[in-house]
Amino acid sequence: MSEYLQQIAKRRTFAIISHPDAGKTTITEKMLLFGNAIKTAGTVKAKKSGIHATSDWMEMEKQRGISITTSVMQFPYNGRIINLLDTPGHEDFSEDTYRTLTAVDSALMVVDAVKGVEDRTIKLMNVCRLRDTPIVTFMNKFDRDTRDPLELLDEVENILKIKCAPINWPIGMGKYFKGVYDLYNDEVTLFETGHGHEIYPYKKIKGLANAKDAIGIDLYEDLEMEIDLVRGASHEFDEQEFLEGNLTPVYFGTALSNFGVKEMMDGFTRYAPAPQHREADQRVVAADEQKLTGFVFKIQANMDEKHRNRIAFFRICSGKYEKGMKIFHERTGKQMQISKALTFMAGEREQVEEGYAGDIIGLHNHGSIQIGDSFTQGEKLKFKGIPNFAPEIFKRVKLNDPLKMKALQKGLVQLSEEGATQVFKPFISNDLVLGAVGVLQFDVVAQRLASEYNVKCSYEGVNVTLARWIFCNDEKKLNDFKKKYEVNLAYDGAGYLTYLAPTGVNLQLAQEKNPDIIFSATREH
């Protein structure tokens, strides 16, 4: 295999999906520890501690102590090059989180075993479903009193509609947690407390029967029964089913104590796919093609007054990036030279000399790049599957100075192109309605309008709870629909027709009465 093909085969690009506080920051940090990216754990402290996590970029993040941005961390592990895309887990996450999942080849789902499957996890899994993304699952916090592990598997299968194949099985929980049993290698790994900040060689015992003394007779007998039950009731791991997104291998452990993370990482790097082919409007692009192609899935604005630059996060789909090369910007039809692309290591920006399929690089953007833009070495290609997602929270924009209306409109359209918010102009009023997935997006927009466009605004409530993009092939039916429902209709910042529903019932009725109209929760960029 050539050096070029080896480089592609090494790449594993994934994101972690979880509900806030399920342990995502902790597990990220342990991965960096195993990848020698940090020397001791505890440097990516939870945000409450005052030591900021390595992925905090914006000032607002530091003030609020949450990770708004989707940063990228690259590190080596087991002969692989891991690209981990960090997704905000906080309540105030945004569409960026959803869109990041369009740039990965697989995902790690972290479940808080005390609480089970939670709301945010369900939403993120629905996004993974759009592309049948392969999922690995880590059941976290077994050093606490958790839910019954069989119950947890049932919940994942029933709520998330994915088959579970446990790879190992917990021995006890909480203060009686003794370790995990590997169902495929007949091996017990014994748990000890106090080793969370280091890579510790936990003791392993080959053969379940040989671990009887170490785990105690009561737990041993319970475990034997549970294993029989698990083997009978759960699914065998099947690599093809996993790659098709139908089945998830499940690992148990506690990220805080750095226990079970290595086993999960070993399994992940073994089974997770290398960079996959990507669909473009014109054709399918294979990862091992020689020419560079890729797309922008996120734009990171720097809130630092001194540096107004923005970074466009670019997923390489094929070919090799080399410093100083020229690329073709499909939307504008212009050539662009990349003199200083960035690579990301846990929040430190470094200039990158080369990149391969699966890698994420940062392009300096002075306003010409938008989310969803495709780049090639000359071919007209537009990658599919980088959607806008319907907002879930809406507010009306109130301008402090009415003379600044033009600047406000310009600012909002530009910020919507960047993915910071979505803007809607209703048919029957001069209002501007903003839509977002997370509350914090409204603060970000107000702050950026003030600093970049010199426009001060505030927000007030608006009678909208849901938005759906409207599509219809029959022009007459579409025109009839527009007349009948003009009170609910608006155009978004890019000029797409949108239905703004005051209630879920209102939307349901409109859908039932208009079977030929498509009400879509996503639209392509």
UniProtKB/Swiss-Prot annotation:
Q: Where does GTP bind?
A: 18-25, 86-90, 140-143
Keywords linked to the UniProt accession: Cytoplasm, GTP-binding, Nucleotide-binding, Protein biosynthesis
Q: Which GO terms describe its molecular function?
A: GTP binding; GTPase activity; guanosine tetraphosphate binding; translation release factor activity, codon nonspecific; translation release factor activity, codon specific
Q: Which CDD domains match?
A: RF3 (cd04169), RF3_III (cd16259)
An example Gene Ontology biological process: regulation of translational termination
Name a single GO cellular component.
cytosol
Q: Name one Pfam family in it.
A: RF3_C
Question: Chief location of this protein?
Answer: cytoplasm
What residue stretches are annotated with the tr-type G domain?
Answer: 9-276
Concerning InterPro entries, the annotation shows: EF-G-like_DII, EFG_III/V, G_TR_CS, P-loop_NTPase, PrfC, RF3_C, RF3_dom_3_sf, RF3_GTP-bd
Localisation per UniProt entry = Cytoplasm
What is this protein for, i.e. what is its function? Increases the formation of ribosomal termination complexes and stimulates activities of RF-1 and RF-2. It binds guanine nucleotides and has strong preference for UGA stop codons. It may interact directly with the ribosome. The stimulation of RF-1 and RF-2 is significantly reduced by GTP and GDP, but not by GMP.
Its family remark reads: Belongs to the TRAFAC class translation factor GTPase superfamily. Classic translation factor GTPase family. PrfC subfamily.
The family database entries (PANTHER family) matched by this protein are listed as: PEPTIDE CHAIN RELEASE FACTOR RF3 (PTHR43556:SF2)
- The protein's name is Peptide chain release factor 3
